[in-house]
Amino acid sequence: MERLNPADCVYIDESGIEESLCREYGRAQRGQKVLGERMGKKAQRLSIIAGLNQKELVAPFHFKGYCDTEVVNSWLENILLPCLKAGQTVIMDNASFHKSTRTKQLLENQGCKLLFLPTYSPDLNPIEQQWAILKARIRKLKTPQQPLEDAIAQVFKQYG
């Protein structure tokens, strides 16, 4: 196996966020309970997709619903590919919607290589840790009155 230059590696992944995302803790006087509102029903789901190149978030995007091949290819073509340079390696998990012929073709036409991580190995994808950090920041910013999309956009802006 050839050795990859970390500067040429772009890890991509997607993650979901429920509209009901809220803080997991609060403060109160000793002996008092912290009360907060939280929806009891299943909320709308938003998904986020991005690349990670040397700790820098690349081409972050959020949308309503779940990820599929069409969404991935549209994001690749319109948002990620303009950020990539020929010779870079795009690394992603083995999700079935990553494995279309079109996905491979888009990357090859850009002069990029495609590499799949082994099945069930999120620990090999550094963007997984970024999702945890991102969701914690979103959780801090999100208020019951504020749409989740606004909190996500605000956090993406902080990443530059």
Where does each model-flagged region fall?
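Extended, low-complexity cationic-aromatic segments
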Residues: 1-77
